[in-house]
Amino acid sequence: KAWGIQLAGWELMEDPGFEPPVPNAEHPEIEADFQYFQKTFADAYFKTISDALKWHAPNQLLLGGRYAVSTPEAVASCAQYCDVLSFNMYTLKPQDGYDFAALRGLDKPVLISEFNFGSTDRGPFWGGLTPLAREEARGPAYATFLKQAMAEPSIVGVHWFQYLDQPVTGRLLDGENGHFGLVGITDVPFQGFVDSVRKSNLAAIQQLGRKAE
């Protein structure tokens, strides 16, 4: 009745062919039940990992789930059981598409576990999930992202993906062949980008040093 469907027995929901109804305004219980299930599932997942880590490797940090998307119920479970919330953010700046007011409300530090900027005018054929028009734009994009990350109090670190361009013929896992490395596949640095990254990182260190004084 709550879902607006006819079902002869609860066990029929376990049938592989069963398709739950799409949430709709007429039956708000559908969305509420989905959210409850998602939270319950995520709680069990993160509690299992947290308990195992505390037992086998105490005094280690649990760095979250490296979310590619922000699902509120799952993120809340992560905050409940993990030491850090981690996200792979393929955006021009961390604040694009992420509700940092809500994240701050969870009272856990945020680690950006992946971000990058690529282009298609150098290296392999793919510019990644945040492609730019040309190689020269990568340095300024990196600087902007880092600056915006430092402006957000909840962010404690950012991690560039990755050091080396991916193989032209595609990596083994899924065929990705992106140009977003600091060096090319022949181990030759993209010097302009490397210099820009170094400049931005040094500026960040100096800024942190001034704040610590």
List where the protein language model places each region.
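Helix N-terminus capping/helix-initiation residues
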Residues: 9, 64, 133-134, 190
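C-terminal structured "cap/appendage" subdomains that terminate the fold
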Residues: 129-179
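Aromatic-rich peripheral "rim/lid" segments of glycoside hydrolase catalytic domains that contact
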Residues: 161-213
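General small-molecule cofactor/ligand-binding pocket signal
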Residues: 13, 63, 159
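Structured segments of extracytoplasmic/periplasmic soluble domains
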Residues: 2, 6, 52-56, 148, ...
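Glycoside hydrolase catalytic-domain groove-lining segments
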Residues: 36-51, 55-128, 143, 147
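Residue-level preference for long, well-ordered alpha-helices that form the structural scaffold
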Residues: 26, 30, 34, 38, ...
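Aromatic- and acidic-residue-enriched carbohydrate-binding clefts of CAZyme catalytic domains
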Residues: 1-32, 121-123
